[in-house]
Regions:
Chain A
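HTH DNA-binding helix-turn interface
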Residues: 21-23, 43-55
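Hydrophobic alpha-helical segments that form the core
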Residues: 139-162, 172-188
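C-terminal peripheral helix-coil segments that are non-catalytic and often amphipathic
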Residues: 164, 168-225
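DNA-binding alpha-helical recognition surfaces that contact promoter or target DNA
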Residues: 30, 44, 153
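Basic, helix-initiating cap at the start of DNA-binding domains
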Residues: 1-21, 25-37, 62
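Amphipathic alpha-helical packing segments from all-alpha helical-bundle domains
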Residues: 109-135, 142-150, 157
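Hydrophobic alpha-helical connector segments
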Residues: 62-103
Length: 225, 225
DNA sequence: CACCGTGATGACACTGAGTATTGTCAATAC
DNA sequence: GTATTGACAATACTCAGTGTCATCACGGTG
């Protein structure tokens, strides 16, 4: 259409003004004026000034939630990696906007706080999903918490690297690497299929003393009480 | 002294009023009036309404920072666990206040956001410290990010459990368990001392097929590229 | 064509957080 | 005794966010 949606015009006006004049210096009136609507209309589309910077977070969160829920215990790991890829893909799709927002968020504490809060919402989602997946196994809550935190941290690390590099390279190989790392690290979280068919690998240095071997074994056993 | 510090009176008045009348329903004027000072005095002691709920976060953060900086690469793990214990100890010291705040934060989204932001600051601190510690090793940034996230997640999991239980039990054994778990999980993050003297443990199910063993080994190797 | 319901928008008023400025008073220094 | 400093109060201001009501465009209906 000739005139893009009001919602989109508002978001664009907001980011442009924040960029030009600074966040605190820009009033909602300014944004509404630039978008050619009234102040009240702004608040009809966005609950707050910050909201205009993160227009589609709720949608994305719902998408991730849906992807996680559309899986069984057998496909949990795939669901998690898929969900993370969805999020990253969302940033990559609109690299222009993502980069501008990244620079903006870096300069405005209020926006940084907002972003951190939304990251926490993803982490909570993953935690709940993984918690259900692991339910019944020992330390399920703890493990779910740790794995959710790691998954989200891995995503953020890759995303930040991509943003800092100016959104130039393809971030999915790094993401796969990072997620592979997380999954390998947490592989022993998976519930043993039938309790007897586990495969575990151990190697010993030929020069290792029996004491050193014992300590390694104790550490290993100590982590699964 | 007969009259406690104004700062303390303000914080107490704030939490009391938030408890009685709700957060949004309480104005800064109310808080100041209850503390027997003027509105402007409130803002002299706290930058915002939320600040009054988390009076000593900055101090605690500085303490943690100091503890981390007062360590070398050799003692990094001890420093991390110590730092986490400092934080938990701070909550336990004043269980009364911690519990009241926990209930309050659970009900007020604005406070929850604030708390999440301060958790992020701890995580950042740990990430930087661990990053320096691992500097030079492959994937140092990624590993630092993951371990910091896990350490913080472990702490929060234990803290939440303690708070939900009403602050009754001693949370340090659970913390040790959780941290032990994290450290065991990330043990292979430690840089090998001299590259040849590692001790690694591997066990195989007697019924495992050679293929299963090979897969396990490949997974193991895949996590250290 | 006149009428009517509906949904989007604007105009406006109000509350309250946070800031900045200025004034006042008391303690301490000199 | 006077000057300086610092803690607090008083006041006015900006602006985010909420709520209410009027207006206008519109599509359908009689």
């Amino acid at each position: 259409m000739a005139t893009p949606s009001i919602s989109h015009r508002l978001a664009e006006a907001a980011v442009a003004l924040f960029d030009e004049n600074g966040y605190d210096e820009t009033t909602v009136d300014d944004i509404a004026a630039r978008a050619g609507v009234s102040r009240s209309t702004f608040f009809r589309y966005y609950r707050s000034k910050e909201d205009a910077v993160f227009p589609d977070h709720d949608t994305l969160l719902a998408t991730v939630d849906a992807r996680l829920r559309a899986s069984t215990a057998d496909t949990a790991i795939v669901a998690v990696t898929d969900a993370v890829r969805i999020v990253l893909a969302h940033y990559v799709e609109d690299a222009e906007v993502s980069l501008r927002r990244y620079r903006l968020v870096g300069r405005v504490p209020a926006l940084r706080a907002r972003e951190i809060a939304s990251v926490a919402r993803y982490q909570r989602l993953f935690r709940e999903f993984i918690g259900e997946w692991l339910a019944g196994s020992p330390d399920a809550d703890l493990r779910a918490e740790l794995m959710a935190a790691s998954v989200v941290a891995a995503h953020n690390q890759v995303l930040r690297g991509w943003l800092r590099a100016g959104g130039t390279h393809d971030p999915f190989p790094p993401l796969d690497h990072a997620l592979g790392y997380v999954i390998a690290t947490f592989r022993h979280l998976e519930r043993p299929q039938d309790g007897k068919d586990q495969v575990v690998v151990a190697t010993f240095s030929r020069s290792a003393s029996p004491q050193a071997v014992m300590e390694a074994i104790q550490d290993h056993l100590g982590s699964r009480p």
